[in-house]
Each structure stands twice: as C-alpha cells, then as structure tokens.
Design a protein with these regions (language model features):
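Buried hydrophobic residues that stabilize the cores of well-folded domains
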Residues: 1-170
C-alpha cells in the first residue's frame, strides 16, 4: 500500500520476512512534483537536483561513500551520459522510435548504469518527472538493446545483455 501526501509518496516494503529487507521508503517531492530526496526509515539516502526539468545530479548519503554523486547530461529529452564522483561514465544511445510507453526502460532494467536514476522506482506505479526518455534506449556504453515492434510502434520484445523480455499490453 502506498501513502500519498502533498509532498511525498511512501511505501512499506516487506521482502523475505526479515530485516534488512523490511523498511519504510519515501520519495520526498518539491512543489512541482519532482523527487528531491529518497528516504529509508526516515534517513535520507539520496538527494536529487534538476536543471530544465531533468535530473542533473544524484547524491548518495551514507557513512561509507559520502559525498558520492552522479551527474547527468540530457539532449532532446534523452539521457546521454551519466558520470560519477570518480569520473566513471556511461554513455547512452537511442532508437529513432518515440517512447510511447511513458516509462524509462533503463531504470532497474538490464543492470545498466547504476540501476537507473531512481533505483527504487519499482515501488511506484510510474516514473517521476525528469527520468523518462523521449525515445527507446538503444545502448548503454557497448551493451546494445534490440526491439521488435508492433504495427503501432510499441515494443513487443526487448533483447539486451543477459535479458530477453516479451511485452504484453492489457
């Protein structure tokens, strides 16, 4: 069950019946509906900054890596590069097909990047503003993603590194 307030979306996560897989997760939103931080059990894990409506920086807050962060570069609504504190980077390419699904296929898919900008977005019914690309992803660095499409341009199959997904629409 999700709990919604004016400035947050929360969920109680319960997996495997034991700690550390049981916790309360919350996305804190600004007045425009953008995620500004992600909390677990009331402790801030990540903070987000935006530029022109897109995530420009994600900072991880924990005792081991603080301040560890990722920066993001966007073009025409598509994430083109992410770079971390240690100058490691991932570059992305896209198909020429418009993204009709209104989801980010990179987030928590294929094990690419750092599991997406919003790594815990799987808790939520949709992606947040500033994380959905305009076109379908085609690659992350040298890991290519291939699609089969139906007559209306929706993907019916996605094949990527160690992945083969058949998509069904209801």
């Amino acid at each position: 069950p999700y709990t919604y307030t004016d400035n947050s979306v929360s969920v109680k996560y319960n997996d495997h019946g034991y700690d550390p897989w049981n916790y309360d997760a919350a996305f804190i939103l600004d007045h425009n509906g953008y995620v500004t931080e992600f909390d677990i059990n009331g402790e801030t894990r990540w903070r987000y900054e935006y530029e022109n409506g897109y995530v420009s920086k994600k900072q991880e807050n924990n005792s081991v890596t603080t301040p560890y962060f990722w920066t993001y570069r966007w073009e025409n609504g598509n994430l083109m590069e992410q770079r971390d504190s240690y100058s490691n980077s991932t570059t992305y390419t896209y198909t020429d097909k418009p993204n009709k699904l209104n989801i980010n296929l990179f987030d928590a898919q294929f094990g690419l990047g750092n599991f997406g900008i919003f790594a815990y977005v799987v808790f939520l019914p949709t992606n947040f503003k500033g994380s959905i690309p305009s076109n379908y992803p085609a690659s992350a660095d040298n890991s290519n993603i291939y699609y089969e499409y139906d007559d209306e341009g929706y993907p019916t199959q996605i094949v990527g590194p160690n992945a083969n997904y058949i998509l069904t629409y209801y």
